[in-house]
């Protein structure tokens, strides 16, 4: 157990801030409950629902960058997860990338990944991670080491900028780099841009070529700082100071490559003083305004599989929407066209216990939450143009590894279903269904939770329509009348259903497919039909237009 009197004075604020943020200490006292759900009172069947769709009304264009993720030098996310160079039990690519993990990530169909943090980014000096390995010194994780070796182990710097780009090329994903604002300088950031994007005639482009990578990487997305509004953060400052310093970074970085997109630190109403001065001072140089959200905003010893906790967690999606709307309004208060500076929700997840940083179990409940969050991202497609699940491997993870094996959890499957099947344009739709009142829980406001969620998308040619229905009822199916205007579907509809044996089902190494996506078919000879969405399921109905 840590004792504050034993902590060196210069680290006291950092540790206090971490504890303030996590509201938990020490790590080893917490247990996660994975038992059978307790018996709940029998509930009546919900009334049949209705979905009405008008394919002639396009409500927004969905940016594929909402299907993104995030990796940080923390726990076994990168070292011991994605990059495992000393592991002789698994096949490796490029001397360190785990092939089984790479295959899992490829199948996820992500569009973008952010690196190297997170809080870690504001302590990371990129030059320590380039060149021959023998020149790269092992480092202490300056921020996360206070939470012990499971969360903040030392790292050997063998996964640096070039290894990150090898990783990106292997999975075919857009890179997003967060520079060191907290302990770095504009000059250091500009040199990193030159190393990644400069041609071989430049000083740092030549260094990249010397390290074996002649062709520029052309990294487009660059973040300046991480959660600088927070007292836990290296570089913590007032919004006015952050904005002025942001402009110094932006000027230096764009002098090297004027075509890069810059992401500024934003916040929701918990830091309501933040966005206005940042936008007023630096708005002309901001490509995206970021903000982070972890729900339910309540740290617990355990989270049961009870029906009430099922609805407590799923209701978090609507708290996220409430906060997105607040951020949208904070932008439009300064910049009349709120779409001019879109939102990058570049960290989101469910997080209720510190153990999830190294023991990442998620149930079908959490997959339904993730699906409900994507429903909301689609609904706000005109403003939310980037969203990154945090994080990809082993830390609050979509993918979990041990030294010999890998599995994915229900949140992974929800991301995969949306990223694979949803189309580009959001179509007008309305849902008529029963709701359930859920009381306030942690930071989640009370809400009348619709049992049925829905997102309807169509491709540019308007010949492929995808209806994604989310049955948020813990035990009952929902028969649903679906009516589609201006689209005559072929009689056979492909169905992709994410589900498991109960709302508390989860995957593990010895039962990797308890929760899975199953492909089915459905027959209908009309644009008006009834489909029954199974209990606790996410279902994509893929319809093709009759020729």
Q: Whereabouts are the PLM-identified features?
A:
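Active-site-proximal helices and loops of the catalytic beta/alpha 8
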Residues: 296, 316-317, 321
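Short hydrophobic targeting helices and cationic amphipathic motifs
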Residues: 3-4
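Non-catalytic accessory regions flanking glycosidase/transglycosidase catalytic cores in CAZymes
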Residues: 15, 20-275, 279-288, 320-547
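Active-site His/acidic residue clusters
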Residues: 293-312
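Extracellular loop and loop/strand-boundary signature of outer-membrane beta-barrel proteins
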Residues: 311-313, 361-362
């Amino acid at each position: 157990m840590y004792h504050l009197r034993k902590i060196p004075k210069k680290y006291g604020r950092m540790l206090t801030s971490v504890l303030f943020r996590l509201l938990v200490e020490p790590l080893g006292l917490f247990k996660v409950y994975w038992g059978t759900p307790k018996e709940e009172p029998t509930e009546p069947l919900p009334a049949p629902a209705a979905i009405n769709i008008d394919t002639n009304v396009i409500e927004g264009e969905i940016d594929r960058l909402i299907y993104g993720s995030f990796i940080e030098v923390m726990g076994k996310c990168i070292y011991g997860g994605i990059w495992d160079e000393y592991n002789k039990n698994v096949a490796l690519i490029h001397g360190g990338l785990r092939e089984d993990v790479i295959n899992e990530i490829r199948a996820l169909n992500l569009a973008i990944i952010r690196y190297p943090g997170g809080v870690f980014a504001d302590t990371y000096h990129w030059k320590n991670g380039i060149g021959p390995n023998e020149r790269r010194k092992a480092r202490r994780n300056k921020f996360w080491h206070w939470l012990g070796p499971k969360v903040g182990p030392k790292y050997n710097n063998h996964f640096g900028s070039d290894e990150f780009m090898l990783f990106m090329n292997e999975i075919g994903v857009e890179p997003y780099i967060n520079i060191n604002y907290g302990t770095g300088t504009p000059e250091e950031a500009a040199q990193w841009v030159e190393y990644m994007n400069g041609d071989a005639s430049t000083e740092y482009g030549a260094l990249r070529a010397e390290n074996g990578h002649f062709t520029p990487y052309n990294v487009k997305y660059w973040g300046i700082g991480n959660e600088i509004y927070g007292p836990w953060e290296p570089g913590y400052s007032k919004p006015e100071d952050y904005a002025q310093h942001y402009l110094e970074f932006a000027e230096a970085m764009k002098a090297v490559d004027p075509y890069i997109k810059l992401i500024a630190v934003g916040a929701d109403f918990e830091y309501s003083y933040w966005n206005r001065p940042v936008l007023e001072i630096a708005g002309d140089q901001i490509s995206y305004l970021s903000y982070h959200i972890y729900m339910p905003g309540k740290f617990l010893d355990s989270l049961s599989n009870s029906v009430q906790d099922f609805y407590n967690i799923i209701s978090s999606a609507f708290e996220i929407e409430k906060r997105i709307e607040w951020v949208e309004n904070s932008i439009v208060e300064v910049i009349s066209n709120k779409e001019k500076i879109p939102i990058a929700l570049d960290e989101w997840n469910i997080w209720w216990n510190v153990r999830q940083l190294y023991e990442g179990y998620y149930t079908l409940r959490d997959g339904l939450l993730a699906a409900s969050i994507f429903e909301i991202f689609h609904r706000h497609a005109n403003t939310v143009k980037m969203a990154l699940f945090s994080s990809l491997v082993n830390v609050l993870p979509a993918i979990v590894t041990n030294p010999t094996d890998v599995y994915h959890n229900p949140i992974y499957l929800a991301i995969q279903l949306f990223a694979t099947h949803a189309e580009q344009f959001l179509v007008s739709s309305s849902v008529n269904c029963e709701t359930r009142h859920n009381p306030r829980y942690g930071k989640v406001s009370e809400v009348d939770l619709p049992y049925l969620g829905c997102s309807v998308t169509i491709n540019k040619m308007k010949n492929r329509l995808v209806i994604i229905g989310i049955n948020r009822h813990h035990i009952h199916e929902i028969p649903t009348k679906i009516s589609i205007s201006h689209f005559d579907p072929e009689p056979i509809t492909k169905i992709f259903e994410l589900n498991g044996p109960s709302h508390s089902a989860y995957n593990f190494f010895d039962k990797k497919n308890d929760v899975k996506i199953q492909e089915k078919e459905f027959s209908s000879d009309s644009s008006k039909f009834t489909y029954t969405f199974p209990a606790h399921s996410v279902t994509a109905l893929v319809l093709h237009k009759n020729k």
